[in-house]
Amino acid sequence: MTKGILGRKIGMTQLFSDNGELIPVTVIQAEPNVVLQKKTLENDGYEALQIGFADKKESRTNKAEKGHAEKAGTAPKRYVREIRGAEVNSFEVGQEIKVDIFESGEKIDVTGTSKGKGFQGVIKRHGQQRGPTTHGSHFHRAPGAMGVIDPMRVFKGKKLPGHMGSEQVTIQNLEVVSVDTDKNLLLIKGNVPGAKKSYVKITSAVKGN
């Protein structure tokens, strides 16, 4: 069964284990999520739980969002995602999901939106090596050859300069170091995608513990 919760990235700090090892952790604030809808095989063709996190201002909410949230008896949410593989029958619409569904030592996958870097060249974007800087070289940070003459075109997927970051990224098999049920916090070993205050989705590890 897949478990999942939505949260907000607060930042990073560090903890010390019982044997004195320093552990870098990311703090995720996961206030109680609300089940907005249950997707079923009969009605939707697949099973999933639709959950919401963080109340949305009424002035920024449209009629459809208000009606959808009212069915669950809650306020419209800013961040709404689906958790596939969840035990749908174990939940009811309007039910709250809290951080206590996870425990220390559990392996999880974290999905977020990476930091936007704007338009970047091939060295920063793809990690390519730069050219010589002296001896008459005119090639320093350019992308290099586009390909051979014969096709008369540039193949799709050619690594070139362009927009970098601001895309969905999932990091797998991260470890839950600690769960604070009083403050609704999850402490996750290592870093997770996104800037501070960005939203993330935390699910059970696909590749298992």
UniProtKB/Swiss-Prot annotation:
Disulfide linkages recorded for this protein, renumbered to the chain, are none
Q: Name one Pfam family in it.
A: Ribosomal_L3
**InterPro entries, sorted:** Ribosomal_uL3, Ribosomal_uL3_bac/org-type, Ribosomal_uL3_CS, Transl_B-barrel_sf
Which keywords does this Swiss-Prot/TrEMBL entry list?
Answer: Ribonucleoprotein, Ribosomal protein, RNA-binding, rRNA-binding
Does the keyword field hold Iron? no
Identify the stretch annotated as signal peptide in this record.
none
Record-linked PROSITE patterns: RIBOSOMAL_L3 (PS00474)
Drop me one GO molecular function for this one.
structural constituent of ribosome
Any single biological process term in GO = translation
Subunit record text:
Part of the 50S ribosomal subunit. Forms a cluster with proteins L14 and L19.
Query: What is the stated purpose of this protein?
Result: One of the primary rRNA binding proteins, it binds directly near the 3'-end of the 23S rRNA, where it nucleates assembly of the 50S subunit.
Protein name, UniProt field: Large ribosomal subunit protein uL3
Q: Which organism is it from?
A: Oceanobacillus iheyensis (strain DSM 14371 / CIP 107618 / JCM 11309 / KCTC 3954 / HTE831)
Q: Upper lineage ranks?
A: Bacteria, Bacillati, Bacillota, Bacilli, Bacillales
The gene coding this protein: rplC
